[in-house]
Amino acid sequence: MAKEDCIEMQGTILETLPNTMFRVELENGHVVTAHISGKMRKNYIRILTGDKVTIEMTPYDLNKGRIIFRSR
Protein backbone atom coordinates (compact mmCIF):
# COMPACT_ATOMS: atom_id res chain seq x y z
CA MET A 1 0.00 0.00 0.00
CA ALA A 2 1.58 3.27 -1.09
CA LYS A 3 1.80 5.96 1.57
CA GLU A 4 0.07 8.62 -0.52
CA ASP A 5 -2.97 6.37 -1.12
CA CYS A 6 -3.73 5.95 2.60
CA ILE A 7 -6.44 7.75 4.53
CA GLU A 8 -5.39 8.66 8.09
CA MET A 9 -8.08 9.06 10.74
CA GLN A 10 -8.32 9.38 14.52
CA GLY A 11 -10.34 6.96 16.62
CA THR A 12 -10.92 5.28 19.97
CA ILE A 13 -10.48 1.58 20.78
CA LEU A 14 -13.86 0.02 21.57
CA GLU A 15 -12.84 -3.59 22.17
CA THR A 16 -9.96 -6.00 21.79
CA LEU A 17 -10.36 -8.94 19.41
CA PRO A 18 -8.16 -12.06 19.03
CA ASN A 19 -4.87 -11.95 17.07
CA THR A 20 -4.05 -8.30 17.90
CA MET A 21 -7.17 -7.03 16.15
CA PHE A 22 -9.20 -4.16 17.56
CA ARG A 23 -12.60 -2.61 16.98
CA VAL A 24 -12.07 1.16 16.55
CA GLU A 25 -14.70 3.90 16.52
CA LEU A 26 -13.60 6.74 14.25
CA GLU A 27 -14.29 10.41 14.94
CA ASN A 28 -17.00 10.42 12.26
CA GLY A 29 -18.89 7.59 14.03
CA HIS A 30 -17.94 4.65 11.80
CA VAL A 31 -16.69 1.46 13.45
CA VAL A 32 -13.84 -0.40 11.73
CA THR A 33 -11.63 -3.41 12.47
CA ALA A 34 -7.92 -2.62 12.71
CA HIS A 35 -4.67 -4.47 13.37
CA ILE A 36 -1.37 -3.20 14.79
CA SER A 37 1.38 -2.09 12.41
CA GLY A 38 4.60 -4.08 12.39
CA LYS A 39 6.71 -1.42 14.13
CA MET A 40 4.22 -1.18 17.00
CA ARG A 41 4.23 -4.97 17.34
CA LYS A 42 8.05 -5.09 17.23
CA ASN A 43 8.40 -2.44 19.95
CA TYR A 44 5.73 -4.05 22.18
CA ILE A 45 3.40 -1.04 22.17
CA ARG A 46 0.42 -1.99 24.37
CA ILE A 47 -3.04 -0.87 23.30
CA LEU A 48 -5.96 -0.95 25.74
CA THR A 49 -9.68 -0.25 25.46
CA GLY A 50 -10.32 3.50 25.44
CA ASP A 51 -6.95 4.50 23.94
CA LYS A 52 -6.90 7.20 21.27
CA VAL A 53 -5.21 5.92 18.11
CA THR A 54 -4.39 7.02 14.58
CA ILE A 55 -5.28 4.49 11.91
CA GLU A 56 -4.61 4.42 8.19
CA MET A 57 -7.04 2.89 5.74
CA THR A 58 -6.93 2.13 2.06
CA PRO A 59 -9.60 3.74 -0.14
CA TYR A 60 -10.48 0.28 -1.49
CA ASP A 61 -11.74 -1.19 1.82
CA LEU A 62 -13.03 1.29 4.38
CA ASN A 63 -13.99 -1.40 6.92
CA LYS A 64 -10.40 -2.40 7.78
CA GLY A 65 -7.38 -0.41 8.88
CA ARG A 66 -3.92 -0.44 10.44
CA ILE A 67 -3.15 1.22 13.78
CA ILE A 68 -0.03 3.32 13.26
CA PHE A 69 0.08 5.52 16.39
CA ARG A 70 -1.24 5.45 19.97
CA SER A 71 -1.80 8.87 21.54
CA ARG A 72 -0.73 9.41 25.12
UniProtKB/Swiss-Prot annotation:
Q: Name one GO molecular function term.
A: ribosome binding
**S1-like domain: from which residue to which, for each copy?**
2-72
Q: Which UniProt keywords apply?
A: Cytoplasm, Initiation factor, Protein biosynthesis, RNA-binding, rRNA-binding
Question: Where, per UniProt, does this protein localize?
Answer: Cytoplasm
One Pfam family it belongs to? eIF-1a
GO cellular component terms, A-Z: cytosol
Keyword hit for RNA-binding: yes
InterPro entries, per database record: NA-bd_OB-fold, RNA-binding_domain_S1_IF1, S1_domain, TIF_IF1
Domain of life from the UniProt record: Bacteria
User: Could you say which residues form the signal peptide?
Assistant: none
Keyword Cell membrane part of the UniProt annotation: no
Spell out where the chain crosses the membrane: none
Q: Which PROSITE patterns match?
A: S1_IF1_TYPE
Q: Which family does it belong to?
A: Belongs to the IF-1 family.
Q: What does this protein do?
A: One of the essential components for the initiation of protein synthesis. Stabilizes the binding of IF-2 and IF-3 on the 30S subunit to which N-formylmethionyl-tRNA(fMet) subsequently binds. Helps modulate mRNA selection, yielding the 30S pre-initiation complex (PIC). Upon addition of the 50S ribosomal subunit IF-1, IF-2 and IF-3 are released leaving the mature 70S translation initiation complex.
NCBIfam families given for it?
Answer: infA (TIGR00008)
Q: How does it assemble?
A: Component of the 30S ribosomal translation pre-initiation complex which assembles on the 30S ribosome in the order IF-2 and IF-3, IF-1 and N-formylmethionyl-tRNA(fMet); mRNA recruitment can occur at any time during PIC assembly.
Which protein is depicted?
Answer: Translation initiation factor IF-1
**What gene does the UniProt entry assign to this protein?**
infA
